[in-house]
Amino acid sequence: QDLKFSANFKLPFKNGNKLKFGAKVVRKTKDKAVDFYEYSPLDEDAFMENSLKNTVDQSNKHFMPNSKYQTGIYASKEYTGALDLNNPALFEKEQVQEELAGNFEARETVSSGYVRFDSKITDRIELMSGLRIENTNLAYTGRTYDADEDITGKTERQRNSYINFLPSLLVKWNVNDDFKVRGSFTQTLSRPKYSALVPSVNIKRSDNEITIGNPELKPTTSYNFDLSADYYFRSIGLVSAGIFYKKIDDFIVDQVSTNYEYQGNVYTRFTQPKNTGNANLLGVELSYQRDFGFIAPALKCIGFYGTYTYTHSRVEDFNFEGRENEEGLSMPGSPAHTANASLYFEKAGLNIRVSYNFASDFIDEMGESTFYDRYYDKVNYMDANASYTFGKKIKTTFYAEANNLLNQPL
């Protein structure tokens, strides 16, 4: 449930200058309350006999893996849908405690105010400057779960609050009607996920593993510097190049430790999200978009869009027990190379598009040493979609799509 209240004001001045200011309050209530039950037939022999009489072959020869994966025989949906699971004369019902471990109650209130001034320095130079202040208040309740003893309990309510000042400065230089240069400095904020903040404790004693939440997580903040140049073609399209730098503080990573002591017990595997350190990112981005009408007018219905981004990242002040002195680490979740490309055809209501996406490998999860780090492999995705719209008074659209044409493992 989200409740939002906001007020915005604008004061115009001479020469096109404007002052904008306002306030906003957002209160979010997010509860996860899942009840999961297992049903066991009281007469297993009769249940098995009836199930085997109501089966259907779910194999589909048009399924992409073909003979590599055959679904096989399953109970029919008509049979399973008609089962009277809540009839105590037929089934025994038991709640699954493990599913309750993921339940939580979360309350988040963000109160913010901003002021922004838009000014025209000259006929070709525009300046936008502003400041946003956000006050965040959090309250979370999670669950504790002991997998071997099948016990679920409720944690104490955890609270946290913080204030952030987020300045911004943007400059746009209209060199001419077709060429524009932009520069900006901003400070941004990224709050932790609900699932990371919940003070939950999940223990699996048979494997001697424990996973806990972290209600003391700080938000990740970033100072951002961007400079870009865009050239717009007289026909539809543009080519642009940009450079960016980000100074990121308190980024969050799932830290995994082995033989870790927690509340008097030593666990073979201990997992918890933590603010792991700071990082510097430097990168360049190139993009191009244009239809092929400049080659021949008949090709105006065909176009291309592509972007490429290179990012170089380095971690500083690494806050991981046993790895504080490591150097040369890349920021988790930050691939060095990403690319997107799309070839499209648009004419007379027919739209066809083929898209390609690439991301190089990157660190996904960090362990107590490089040996335990987990990497996400490089990925190549290709998708295609087509639609056709016809009709004047009543428009009708047919749409089709095909995903993961390169059969990239997910």
Regions found by a protein language model. Give the residues of each.
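Flexible glycine-rich, low-complexity coil/linker segments exposed to the extracellular/periplasmic environment
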Residues: 1, 44-102, 258-261, 265-272, ...
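Short loop/turn motifs that connect adjacent beta-strands in outer-membrane beta-barrel proteins
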Residues: 10-19, 34, 123-124, 178, ...
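Conserved C-terminal beta-signal and adjacent last beta-strands/turns
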Residues: 1, 5-10, 17-20, 169, ...
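Gram-negative outer-membrane beta-barrel transporters
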Residues: 5, 245-248, 257, 265-363
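Surface-exposed extracellular loop regions of Gram-negative outer-membrane beta-barrel proteins
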Residues: 1-13, 18-22, 108-174, 299, ...
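Transmembrane beta-strands of outer-membrane beta-barrel pores
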Residues: 23-31, 133-139, 185-191, 200, ...
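Residue-level signature of outer-membrane beta-barrel architecture
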Residues: 9-11, 115, 119-121, 125, ...
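Outer-membrane beta-barrel signature, preferentially recognizing the C-terminal barrel domain
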Residues: 98, 102-111, 160, 189-248, ...
